[in-house]
Regions:
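Compact, charge-rich alpha-helical regulatory domains located at protein termini
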Residues: 415-423
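A short acidic-Thr-Gly-centered motif at the start of a beta-strand
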Residues: 369-377
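Alpha-helical scaffolding within the catalytic cores
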Residues: 407-412
Length: 478
């Protein structure tokens, strides 16, 4: 007869007195899903045989990548019967709070910036975590005595308290060295060509890539950073990374790629609509991975990834950020509500139902390519990427306009005769969709976006201008 007091790990039934504890405990031998993206999400699959796969850390028991280091961090300090105090943007301290009872921890307090979203704040309270809000940025400076990190350290030194310290405790990357890295290698072996992660504490990159580079010395490694003044949860700007003590720089083989909130949320939305319920930091890493692949192809080195997998990390789910998707992407990214009831749409009572959001059509790379070959092209191309990206490569005939200046550009344009059609271009489609929506709202009627952005254009091998390259301007880089 089966002993029901045993934890049945083979069939993932966690039974007996320690069943819940064993379910929550990270396990290297229970594989976190690795899912290859279909061609609808991978513009390089058919053209270059480059595969993109997502490591779905959102499928862990606590729903986020930080639950791995959180468990290791708690076990690295004497936390039993103590009050844990931790500075965290959300998922680390959330996980600590949910591990607390099974590990015999008295209580957990989060020290957080007052810029935290309401959704994240309520999630912590839902988990029974005490919250101390302090002044300061969402990504605090570990060396600032007034930052949430320093405050958590001081509180952790008080009697009965402890501070695990995710920003400088090597238990953070060790969790990924023990679990994430070996799993990815077991799942792909030598078919792994590049590993990409968003950079916050850098623990995921340092631990995972640190292990992978030992077994695959030729592995390419990329880090993704946040564009300044953009809200993407859990990740830092390149300047903010100077405050991190882990040795992340020596692991990278690629230049840092900066992604903004619009591309992060839009890329996440693309994955959600294919069935992967991942959050904005997942879209952030995905968009960064696509940009790195595009850069490698444009440098003439696409063959080094041919037949290989590029793996990026999905840190958490979309559910804590639902309101932010609508706020950042705007209503044009979502289906209209057909309200045939007698009352207002729930949650939209104050809105004017006749004031419908602008709908933006896209143009395929093939259609735009055929147009620019004409003597008098129909479309004017507006590239809203950063100047650095534009001067690295761009579509012939395009004009660079800063995304942050689109409102001024459109306001000036609407005072002239509007007979032209404008195609907005970015690396994917997130930023260009938002820019086109702004222009249309101001009064520029004939606006479109390039489907798939410059990533899709490059994947097709269409002509690009390469100011920083010695290659001929009109020769496709394959």
């Amino acid at each position: 007869m089966m002993n029901l007091n045993m934890t049945m790990q083979n069939n993932r039934a966690y039974l007996g007195a320690d069943g819940l504890k064993n379910y929550l405990k990270p396990k290297a031998d229970e594989y976190i899903p690795l899912v290859e993206l279909p061609s609808e999400l991978n513009p390089f699959l058919e053209s270059h045989d480059i595969h993109i796969s997502a490591k779905l850390m959102n499928t862990l028991p606590l729903g986020n990548v930080k639950s791995l280091p959180a468990y290791y961090l708690l076990n690295s300090v004497d936390a039993i019967s103590k009050n844990v105090v931790e500075s965290s943007s959300g998922n680390t301290v959330f996980s600590m709070g949910l591990f607390a009872k099974s590990l015999g921890i008295k209580s957990v307090k989060a020290v957080k910036s007052n810029t935290v979203t309401r959704g994240k704040l309520q999630l912590l309270r839902l988990a029974g975590i005490d919250v101390l809000l302090v002044d300061g940025p969402i990504c605090p400076d570990a060396h600032d005595p007034n930052s949430s990190i320093s405050i958590a350290r001081r509180l952790g030194n008080e009697s009965g308290n402890c501070n695990p310290g995710q920003y400088d405790n090597f238990a953070n990357p060790q969790a990924h060295r023990d679990v994430t890295g070996p799993q990815i290698f077991d799942q792909l072996g030598e078919n792994l060509g590049m590993f990409v992660a968003g950079l916050g504490t850098t623990g995921t990159l340092v631990g995972t890539a640190g292990y992978l580079k030992e077994v695959l010395p030729e592995l390419r490694v990329g880090g993704v950073v946040r564009v300044p003044n953009n809200q993407v949860p859990g990740v830092r700007t390149s300047n903010d990374l100077r405050e991190i003590d882990f040795n992340w720089k020596d692991i990278l083989t690629e230049d840092l790629v900066a992604i903004d909130e619009v591309d992060a949320y839009k890329s996440s939305l693309d994955m959600i609509r294919q069935g992967l319920l991942v959050g904005p930091s997942s879209g952030f890493a995905y968009a960064g991975a696509c940009t790195m692949i595009e850069n490698i192809i444009n440098s003439g080195n696409g063959d080094m990834l041919r037949g290989k997998h590029v793996v990026f990390v999905c840190p958490d789910s979309c559910f804590p950020y639902v309101e932010e998707y609508f706020e950042i992407l705007g209503e044009s990214s979502f289906p209209e509500i057909d309200n045939q009831s007698s009352g207002p749409v729930p949650g939209f009572e104050g809105n004017n139902s006749n004031n419908k959001p602008a709908r933006i059509d896209d143009i395929s790379p093939e259609k735009l390519y055929e147009d620019i070959k004409k003597t008098n092209p129909k479309f004017k191309i507006i590239d809203v990427r950063e100047p650095r990206e534009f001067f690295d490569h761009h579509i012939k005939g395009s004009k660079q306009v800063s995304y942050y200046n689109i409102e001024d550009w459109a306001t000036q344009l609407k005072d002239t005769e509007l007979t032209d059609s404008y195609v907005f271009v970015c690396s994917r489609t997130g930023r260009s969709l938002r820019a086109a929506s702004i222009a249309k709202k101001i009064g520029i009627e004939n606006v479109f976006v390039l489907a798939g952005g410059t990533a899709a254009w490059s994947a097709k091998g269409f002509d690009r201008v390469l100011p920083n390259s010695c290659l001929p301007n009109n020769k496709p880089v394959l």
